[in-house]
Amino acid sequence: LPLRLLQIPIRRDLLAQAVFDSLTVHKLVEMRHIYQPGCICLPEQAMNEIMTQLYRRGLTVVSNRRGYGLYYTKGDTLQFLELQADNDHCADLLLQAAREKTGAQNARILLAENQTLYLGAGRRCGYGMIAFLGRPFPTTDAYFRMLL
């Protein structure tokens, strides 16, 4: 599926709460099936290896009972590889909690075109991390977006 790239400022909310880096791979797979029922998932052992590689590269997971997000911090911007939530308000709460943790004021979010979060916002872009990174990348590394 094509992707939508959304760049937005993150409003400050000192009361936004979420937990960080506590989402197990088993729970991540469960949540993916809830939010993206048609997604293709690797076996749990392979997902463990991919998540380990991503954590080593600085990935952070923000989650609460209404959604989750996987992101890297780059300067003043949180770059979300994946954001899934019950609705826009729940997604905003995840963004705000991540802002309070990192101090970053902006978000760059990749959404699957069929996701209903921030419907109609953002611009359409090609599939995969090529659009996300904006530069060549080694194809021997884990390619996380292929899993959605």
Annotate each predicted stretch with a short phrase.
Residues 1-14, 84-88, 96-148:
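Active-site/acyl-donor-binding loops of N-acyltransferases
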Residues 2-82:
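Amide-forming acyltransferase catalytic core, primarily the GNAT-like/NAT-type
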Residues 35, 55, 68-72, 89, ...:
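Sequence-level detector for tyrosine residue identity
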